Curated annotation (Swiss-Prot):
This is Histidinol-phosphate aminotransferase 1. Homodimer. The modification N6-(pyridoxal phosphate)lysine is found at residue 229. HAMAP family: HisC_aminotrans_2 (MF_01023). GO terms for biological process: L-histidine biosynthetic process. The lineage of its organism: Bacteria, Pseudomonadati, Pseudomonadota, Gammaproteobacteria, Chromatiales. It comes from Nitrosococcus oceani (strain ATCC 19707 / BCRC 17464 / JCM 30415 / NCIMB 11848 / C-107). Pathway: Amino-acid biosynthesis; L-histidine biosynthesis; L-histidine from 5-phospho-alpha-D-ribose 1-diphosphate: step 7/9.
Length: 370
């Protein structure tokens, strides 16, 4: 059979791979359940959407869609360089920050190597390592977040990479500046730390690290960020990495040509200039987080305190069943069973009316289980 032959020919890491499962799209829910006006609070998107300046920039380049994009992303790299105060040759662009997570692994990881990440980590980390045929080491979490001391102890001569998310997805926990820098200082130079800061713009904590200041001190540090979250450009897929220039050069060697499209490049460059949209997004998130967590407390539900734009809550029963019942009422959240949290669901902070709809439906669903 042709199908079974392909399964036999597939690389060992791919044969046993379970594909990454994104949040269910609204269109799919409405097709399956026949509901209208569904609310999606599953994928940590900005409920305000993109900056108007980003939308204008997209329209401005639509007419040039017949041309290939700037493969080096000069304009965006220049804007990022000015915004972040770092040289452009330390910046690598990706089709979402997931590209950068992969590029680093492809540059450094061979099957004999090991990669370390935390127990409750972004699902893509172990998937990437499995594809490459290397060994992944999930270090047990501490308080739903990273146990940095245990992660240092897990490092050996075969370790090449450590993934750290700050804030962490899916739990929303975060690492203080002093503990994270102590972790960096304790690692041998042959181990690259990929610091995933997809949600850093949402953090409002005095002890949250300004990691870019560490770049000259720790050449084995790479920072990844995205325009998919607070900048509201998830549908265009664009992110960036900041690293030592030599690592940036190596990642550009494995980066596919024209991996970032013209619309994304223009939108991201414009979005960097719209500070008002960024502030509005933060305010909406802070208000929405308070709205959700107050409701959880009123319902007697425990939640993991989060500094990001989502919160993970213990629904005191099967998270999968609660998720399915929420779907029937037209609300999409994210079940956490696949992350080892079978009684939890993760909820993106939405607009006030979206949060209110979710809270109302959650009350109904929980009552159905009583």
């Amino acid at each position: 059979m042709a199908e079974s032959l392909f399964y036999q020919l597939a690389a060992a890491g791919v044969q046993g791979l379970t594909p990454y499962q994104p949040g269910k799209p609204i269109e799919e829910l409405e097709r399956e359940y026949g509901v209208r006006g569904a609310v999606k609070l599953a994928s940590n998107e900005n409920p305000l959407g993109p900056s108007p300046m980003a939308i204008d920039a997209i329209y401005g380049v639509l007419g040039e869609s017949g041309r290939y994009p700037d493969g080096n992303g000069f304009a965006l790299k220049t804007a990022l360089s000015q915004c972040l105060g770092i040289p452009a040759n330390q910046i690598t662009l990706g089709n979402g920050s997931s590209d950068l997570l992969e590029f680093a692994a492809r540059v450094l990881i061979s099957p004999e190597h090991e990669v370390i990440y935390s127990q409750y980590c972004f699902a893509l980390y172990p998937l990437l390592i499995q594809i490459l045929g290397a060994k992944g080491h999930a270090v047990p979490a501490k308080g739903f977040g990273h146990d940095l001391e245990a992660m240092v102890k897990a490092v050996n001569s075969q370790t090449r990479l450590v993934y750290i998310a700050n804030p962490n997805n899916p739990t929303g926990t975060w690492l203080h500046s002093d503990e994270l820098e102590a972790f960096l200082a304790a690692l041998p130079e042959h181990v690259l730390v990929v610091l995933d800061e997809a949600y850093y713009e949402y953090v409002n904590e005095a002890q949250y690290p300004y990691s870019l200041a560490w770049m000259s001190r720790y050449p084995n540090l790479m920072i990844t960020r995205t325009f998919s979250k607070i900048y509201g450009l998830a549908g265009l897929r664009i992110g960036y990495g900041v690293s030592h220039p030599d690592l940036a050069d190596l990642m550009n060697r494995v980066r596919p040509p024209f991996n970032v499209n013209s619309l994304a490049l223009a939108a991201a460059t414009a979005a960097l200039q719209d500070h008002d949209h960024l502030q509005r997004s933060r305010k909406v998130n802070q208000a929405g987080m308070a709205q959700l967590t107050m409701a959880f407390t009123a319902l007697g539900l425990d939640y993991i305190p989060s500094v990001a734009n989502f919160v993970t809550v213990d629904v005191k029963q099967s998270g999968d069943k609660v998720y399915e019942n929420l779907l029937r009422h037209g609300v999409i959240v994210r079940p956490m069973t696949g992350y080892g949290l079978p009684r939890h669901v993760r909820v993106t902070v939405g607009r006030e009316e979206e949060n209110a709809r979710f809270i109302q439906v959650l009350e109904t669903v929980l009552e159905e289980f009583r």
